[in-house]
Design a protein with these regions (language model features):
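Short coil/turn linker and secondary-structure boundary residues
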Residues: 16-21, 52, 143-146, 158-162, ...
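Short, compositionally biased low-complexity segments
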Residues: 30-34, 63, 131-152, 178-185, ...
Length: 243
């Protein structure tokens, strides 16, 4: 239920071009949720990138249930913009997050920040990003859904044992911790919202407006058409959508 609440709050009360969840709201409704530290846009990665102290990093990481590291290709733009000098520098950022997780006893998970399924699908994302004004739209990061073997190869610099831990063991542990649930109780239907009294309210509103236009006694053709439309809407459970 907390996940539903947060999604609703984000879209209805905290929409700033994109849905947002304030930290205070997340803390209020955190029970039952598992929260990771995110990609390079997350506060932990950026703090590591800034070279913050270990004390500061631990304070930030304390918020999260697991820490994330990603393939260095995901963050190659940091080399293009001069923030990081080499690929080894990108690996060092991941190594620091791994060391932080080990020290704090938090699982570290290798995630892909997947935006598309196949490598060739990068073309479509580049088109979308170009339309949104990104200067480097054609220099797409390899954000496709990698296989287990590909991820093990990506993180081989951590050593075989640690690579298997972050690529296989810890992701499976997180997945096993997630409750299986259905978003809808029934697999059939259109899942329109339902409000108490919606059927009567819709019918009364329609009749009131019709009488305002045509008078106390509705013409037969109007009454038949009104009945047909209302019966279709109400009969299919869509009354609430029209209010």
């Amino acid at each position: 239920m907390n996940l539903y609440r947060l999604v609703s709050y984000a879209h209805l009360e905290h929409l700033r071009k994109v849905p947002q969840i304030p930290r205070s709201l997340l803390n209020m409704h955190r029970e039952g949720l598992i929260i990771g530290s995110a990609c390079e846009a997350g506060e932990l990665f950026r703090a590591v990138l800034r070279g913050e102290s270990e004390e500061k990093l631990m304070s930030i990481a304390d918020m999260y249930d697991y820490l994330e590291i990603q393939p260095i290709g995901n963050n190659a733009f940091l080399m293009r913009n001069g923030t990081v000098d080499t690929e080894e520098g990108l690996r060092d950022l991941n190594r620091r997050i791994v060391a932080l997780g080990d020290k704090m006893g938090k699982p570290v998970v290798a995630t892909g920040d997947v935006h598309f399924l196949e490598p060739d699908d990068a073309l479509f994302r580049s088109i979308i990003m170009h339309a949104r004004g990104f200067d480097d739209a054609e220099q797409q990061a390899p954000l496709y859904f990698k296989t287990t073997d590909e991820m093990l190869e990506e993180f081989s610099y951590l050593g075989e044992e640690k690579a298997r831990e972050v690529v296989i063991t810890n992701p499976n542990m997180i997945a096993d911790s997630c409750e299986r649930m259905k978003a809808f109780l029934s697999e059939k239907g259109t899942y329109a919202p339902t409000f108490p009294g919606a059927n009567d309210e819709l019918r009364n509103m329609a009749l009131k407006k019709a009488h305002e236009i045509y008078g106390d006694e509705l013409p037969e053709v109007v009454q038949k058409r009104l009945d047909k439309e209302l019966n279709s809407i109400i009969g299919n459970g869509y009354s609430s959508l029209y209010l």
